[in-house]
Regions:
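Short gly/ser/thr-rich secondary-structure transition/capping motifs
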Residues: 15-23, 87, 141
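N-terminal membrane-anchoring alpha-helices
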Residues: 1-19
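Non-catalytic C-terminal accessory region of glycerolipid acyltransferases
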Residues: 91-196
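Short, flexible active-site-adjacent loop segments at beta-strand->alpha-helix junctions, enriched
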Residues: 26, 40-41, 48, 63, ...
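Structural motif corresponding to alpha-helix initiation and N-cap regions
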Residues: 22-25, 68, 90-93
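Catalytic core of membrane glycerolipid acyltransferases/transacylases, capturing the structured
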Residues: 6, 15, 28-87
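Short amphipathic alpha-helix with an adjacent loop that forms part of the alpha/beta core around
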Residues: 26-29, 97-98
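A generic structural signal for alpha->beta connector loops
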Residues: 19, 54-56, 77, 103, ...
Length: 196
């Protein structure tokens, strides 16, 4: 209930402040868990990509973001969970897969950091490994900003068609080459959505 209230208030605020629009909402699965893989340009991205997702998403966020109690409460309301840097890839992957297997959707930014100039980076293979181990579809998402984040600058959030586990054609213990190919497929889809 708190999540729904915050989400609806955020939609209204973003529409007034930025003129936000959404495309491809019909591509979000109605049932089952899934991963949303999105480009990363702004601290607002986790909120933006989840505004049209009916079921709450979870997010990985660096532990430092949870030090401020007010900000911590806000990002936890949107499903963020802390990840300790240096925890090791396997530990982070296990947590993410556990969230998906417990029935929660996962939003992830494969680039691993924000893009300063808006170009979509190469991404990392973690998103591919999580998808492979959890056996869930990946919904590519592109957030396109018109210029910088200033009042009334347009933001468009685009959701692409889900990439199903069958389309991924990957084992649950994939080789590095398989992971790289899958990551490239996901990143190409994201780039296409951003540049459309």
């Amino acid at each position: 209930m708190v999540y729904a209230f915050i989400r609806n208030a955020a939609i209204l605020a973003y529409k007034i402040w930025y003129g936000i629009s959404f495309e491809g909402v019909e591509n979000l699965p109605e049932e089952g868990t899934f991963i949303i893989a999105c480009n990363h340009r702004s601290y607002a991205d986790p909120v933006l990509l989840s505004l049209k997702v009916k079921r709450r998403c979870t997010y990985m966020a660096k532990e430092e973001l949870f030090k401020n109690p007010v900000f911590s409460a806000l990002i936890r309301a949107f499903g963020a969970f802390p990840v300790q840097r240096g925890q090791g890839d396997n530990g982070i992957i296990d947590i993410a897969v556990g969230k998906l297997k417990s029935g929660k959707n996962l939003a992830i930014f494969p680039e691993g950091t924000r893009s300063k100039d808006g170009t979509v980076g190469r991404g990392k293979t973690g998103v591919a490994l999580i998808a492979a181990r959890a056996g869930v579809p990946v919904v590519p998402c592109g957030i396109a900003y018109e210029g910088k984040l200033h009042f009334r600058n347009k933001i468009t959030v685009r959701y692409g068609k889900p990439i199903s586990p069958e389309q991924l054609k990957i084992s649950d213990n994939p080789a590095p080459r398989e992971l790289k190919e899958l990551k490239n497929t996901i990143m190409s889809s994201i780039t296409e959505l951003v540049e459309r």
